[in-house]
Each structure stands twice: as structure tokens, then as C-alpha cells.
């Protein structure tokens, strides 16, 4: 990816604050996206990503929308609720609490990198249908929205995640890739 553009363009929002989110954001930026915004419901201080990964994302030009919880994506816009930090949870991190205020991020593609569980509320808010196991299809019923990795399969192996990533790249970019 460092050597060339693989065809990603426009504004991309990556949801999450861990190492996977940092990797997805950096890859999108290096692949030709005009603007990549990492959306996280807490502040950078509470991001689970390694400091090194965070520094690399910043160096690559990834923008950060902190204290932001996505609620809807439609017509090229990601609507987020502004969050405030409340009391600490079991992990020791202060829990995000909705403020009732909303803002918008221009976005042509959303990449959700928030863990192994499907966010049912986010899926429902965006009209994404789930199967009987509570998982979305690879190419969901919403045009331009794909599910891959743990969101599609549940907890799985790295090899399965890489296979899903290759299928996603082929679907979005239109070119088969081998890894």
C-alpha cells in the first residue's frame, strides 16, 4: 500500500479507538482517501490503541473526532452525538454519556472497527438487517455497506479476517487481491 494507490477515494470515517481502527484509518489514508476521520466516543487519553499506533495515525494525517458516537449514516453524512465523560467504568476509563447535541461528518464510507460484537443499535438505526445469529450479511441490504471479520462471522481467526478483508477490498475497489 505504501507504493501505490489502490483506489479508495473521498471521505472515510473509521469508528473505534483500538489498534484495528488505527490500522484501518491509516490504510484508508494511504490508499487515497481525501479525508479520514477516526470517530471515538471517548478522548484519545482513553483509547485502547497503543501509543505507537496512535502516533502513526496522526503522522499519516488521520483526523480525530473525539467524544463522538455515530448514530446514523445517510446521503454522504455521518451523524454523531457529542458525548461527555461520566464516571469510570470497570476498565477504569470514564464512560461516555450522550449530551443530546449532534454534529455531522462528511463521509462516503464508514468502517466499523469496534470489536467482536455487532452493534445492534447502530445496525438498526441504519436499517441494516441481521440474520438469525444477529449478524449482517457481507454485502448488507444497504447499498455500499459491507460487514467483514468478527462483525460478519463472530470471533474468528486472523486468517478468516484477512480473507474477509480481501473480499471487502475486491467488492469496494473492484480488483482481486492476494495476500
Q: Model-found features: residue ranges?
A:
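Hydrophobic residues embedded in beta-strands of well-ordered beta-sheets
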Residues: 76-78, 136, 145
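A Rossmann-like FAD-binding core segment of flavoenzymes
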Residues: 1-9, 30-132
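Cofactor-binding loop segments of dinucleotide-utilizing enzymes, especially the Rossmann-like FAD-
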Residues: 17, 40-43, 150
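A conserved FAD-binding loop/helix module that cradles the flavin
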Residues: 24, 148-179
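Glycine-rich dinucleotide-binding loop and its adjacent helix/turn
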Residues: 1-31, 130-143
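Feature representing long, continuous alpha-helical segments
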Residues: 22, 26, 68, 108-112, ...
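Short, well-ordered coil/turn residues at beta-beta hairpins
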Residues: 15, 107, 113-114, 141, ...
